[in-house]
Amino acid sequence: MITVLRVEGFRIVIFSDDHEPAHVHVFGDGEAKINLSGPNDRPELIWAVGMKHADIRKSMRLIERNREALLVRWNEIHG
């Protein structure tokens, strides 16, 4: 598990042994898995457990703002 970003109380990680499609796991009070290239090349929530709806929305905005950098990190980690 590689922490690629810490921001606004969230820890965003990429698992080095994970699978495509490119996605991140967001940890806060719960966990969310977010696809980096969903419909229209926008982040897409795959699932969330134990997160408030407000935190899910906030994490989606954070991923959208940092999407390009996160895709670069995904490719660095997974080749």
Say what each PLM segment does.
Residues 2-4, 42-47, 66:
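Generic preference for hydrophobic/aromatic residues in regular secondary structure cores
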Residues 1-22:
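Short, charged/polar N-terminal "headpieces" of proteins
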Residues 51-79:
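C-terminal structural segments of small proteins and small subunits
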Residues 12-16, 36, 71-78:
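Broad hydrophobic/π-residue packing in well-ordered secondary structure
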Residues 15-53:
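A short, structured beta-strand/loop element
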